[in-house]
Curated annotation (Swiss-Prot):
Cofactor: how bound: Binds 1 [4Fe-4S] cluster per subunit. The cluster is chelated by three Cys residues, the fourth Fe has a free coordination site that may bind a sulfur atom transferred from the persulfide of IscS.
Location of region: Disordered: 1-20
Compartments (UniProt record): Cytoplasm
Pathway: tRNA modification
Organism annotation: Chelativorans sp. (strain BNC1)
Protein's name according to its UniProt entry: tRNA-cytidine(32) 2-sulfurtransferase
Amino acid sequence: MTFHQPVSETAQPDEASGHPLFADAPSSVEFNKLRKRLLRQVRQAFEDFTMVKPGDRWLVALSGGKDSYGLLAVLLDLKWRGLLPVELLACNLDQGQPNFPKHILPDYLTRLGVPHRIEYQDTYSVVTEKIPENRTYCSLCSRLRRGHLYRIAREEGCSSLVLGHHREDILETFFMNFFHGGRLAAMPPKLLNDEGDVLVLRPLAYCAETDLVKFAEGMKFPIIPCDLCGSQDGLQRNAMKAMLEDIERRMPGRKDTMIRALANVRPSHLLDRQLFDFAGLGIL
């Protein structure tokens, strides 16, 4: 993908160096290209959306899924190379899901020497009490989790909460709002919370989910499945994912085009009277 003011290829450090978590990473040309691409795309997001303020402290949400592992790895890699002048604190919120393997994340983070906080909050019981058994838990679960992460960010003196949403998450959200919400809205790479005291950052905004899958496989992250609670993600999001995959299969490169479109809005060619003064438009 090409964006305005692209990060220079010459600014990329040698892929042989990096954080110790890459000590056992594949040495293949293909994996090194993948790793360099993720680094470049994250740095591009930093630039495009002014995410980095030197000296800040970031709370990096770590669920145990491929996306959050990939996010943490890229951030640690950039920090190790001197390209991310912020302090990182990894955080996992144990929400009391059945059979959640409590040892995996603390063991992984301790072994790598990554500063972290493990927080236990039984939101699972709250969700199962309020949501009928045949409905998906994901929406309420996510809202409760976000509230606790904001609180933890405040307690830890973190200015930003960093999440692992990627390119496909943004596009799926856009089309869910488009088809089901009747509005043009996606998932912003940078957002100020309602209280105005914590920024939400999504550095993987330009990263493809397929790349994150390959990266996780190469790094052999100890993945924790996201369906421990027995609930499945909403049917609407699954339908949007299937639609996007079908479009990309038939017309390769369309996802990149869609992401570029979200950064190229023409209010005068839409119907929102709050964004464009149609009443004041006329022949002089």
